[in-house]
Amino acid sequence: MNVRNFSIIAHVDHGKSTLADRILERLGAMGERDKRDQTLDTLELERERGITIKSTPIRLTYRRANGEEYTFNLIDTPGHVDFGYEVSRSLAACEGVLLLVDASQGVEAQTIVNAYLAIDNNLEIIPVVNKIDLPAADPEGAAQELEEVIGIPAEEAVFASGKTGQGVDQILEAIVERIPPPPGDPQAPLKALIFDSFYDAYQGVILFVRVLEGTLKPKQKIMLFSNGKSFEVDKVGTFSPGLVVGDALSAGAVGWVAASIKDIHDAQVGDTITEKDRPTAEPFPGFKPAQPVVFSGLYPTDTEDYRKLREALEKLKLNDAAFTFEPETSEALGFGFRCGFLGLLHAEIVQERLEREFDLDLIATAPAVVYRVTLTNGEVFETQNPAEFPTRDRIARVEEPYIKLSIMLPEEYVGPVMQLLQERRGNMVTMNYVGKRVELIYEVPFAEILYDFHDRLKSISRGYASMDYEQIGYREGDLRKVDILVNGEVVDALAVIVHEDKAYSLGRKIVDKMAEVIPRQLFPVPVQAAIGGKIIARATVKAYRKDVLAKCYGGDITRKKKLLEKQKKGRARMKQIGTVEVPQEAFLAVLSTEE
């Protein structure tokens, strides 16, 4: 069977989508009219940021010099650390991968992680050194690094350039020769892996599948393993980019299925499809519902939009298996949703897609991780919302998630980066030298890298450092909840959970920032940061002042005192009943103090 299923994996920005464009062009899948960059990046946002978020598959035909025809299924994958689960599912649908390395930058943190993912899935790896047309390129050096770090022999590497198209023919030949054809018996009971899905207004949920065994065809009754629900297949087909209707998908094929599935939650990515009357013995292993690790509240600026936001989140969840949300209310912001994401980039993209595609105006609260709290009565519970954090006298201990962080960087930046990691409470595990570069491995509390760690890392290393991380479980920490009070009232949406050592400085920054953005009232407004009952920082928004003495020319001092006293009493009365509106900018200001 002349079929090859493969995927391209690389570190962000190593030219994966551009190389995919050249392969499509060489195989005639792009007419002159379609020639735009990053053909496989379908979301407007992906093209704008130049990153791949959703995995997009495509079917191609390759004719060798001797006239043999091969069908290639290329599954494009995201390269960003947040979308690791998407990558792992796309890889499960392949037999081999092209592992791209930028000739001018060498092996980066994610290259290593992606390579190990491929090795774990027993995939054939074809190393490709890309961007050899760059003046700073050192293809032999990059191939050598691959051998040192991952153990892929340097002589196996194919040198190519996604820009000029050089080396594309060698890559195509390598795919035919090195990647094995897909196994599987078309006569066996049906077994197909869902590696992505999206919602279509007319056909319901459309599943992207890799058929492992058996044959999938219209009118068939299929069943989903994870929940036992069954559906009838309406249409099947392949991708060329865009959905093309076909007759059937047999073992080894990659394609799509429409089966009038109305609810997105029925079709989980990573689930196995089988035939209802003749089910396969066991599902494809490794299915795990994606676990969100970063949480943030999303609130509509206009409370009227609550329903609209809910519908938008439902629709987005359709295409994004890893995103979760549940309703929550805040005294300060009204009704909204607590949303879970795979990471910060994921959170940013979801928010941007909501604002763009559904025309919503949103406020996001500070991102938080999931803390595990043990109370004095022995009860254990998890919370990611600082507003739900219990008071200090009820807490026996608090644990926070830690990550194993690996950073690749040129050796001259090691000092400043280690200092940054020390500030972020990191513990060093090991340090490896790879040529002129260093791999640092640290264990760091996840919360410490949430806000601006990546930006700081990039600026300290002039953009040369790259990072990747994985969760390694919970550890105990001295964490405190800092409450922010405006005019004596606690503003729940502004609470933050922070390590004891940083509580004072963070509280100070927040109150100073808040005092700048809260509009002045007719009475002075204190803004305070508190841990439990203890105030640790305060700033005051000065009052507007009416000049009550304007009418007194010269004259008696007692008269002036009387007027000032009267003004003071009026203010005191106003302060008791006056409420202070905390404006939108104040919430955003808190997020930006996180430096």
Swiss-Prot record:
KW GTP-binding (keyword) present? yes
- Domain of life, per the record? Bacteria
Membrane topology of the entry: Peripheral membrane protein
* One GO term describing the cellular component: plasma membrane
Q: Where in the cell is it found?
A: Cell membrane
Q: Which UniProt keywords apply?
A: Cell membrane, GTP-binding, Hydrolase, Membrane, Nucleotide-binding, Protein biosynthesis
Residues in coiled coil = none
- Domain (tr-type G) ranges: 1-183
Q: Which reaction does it catalyse?
A: GTP + H2O = GDP + phosphate + H(+)
Q: Which family does it belong to?
A: Belongs to the TRAFAC class translation factor GTPase superfamily. Classic translation factor GTPase family. LepA subfamily.
Name of the protein in its database record: Elongation factor 4
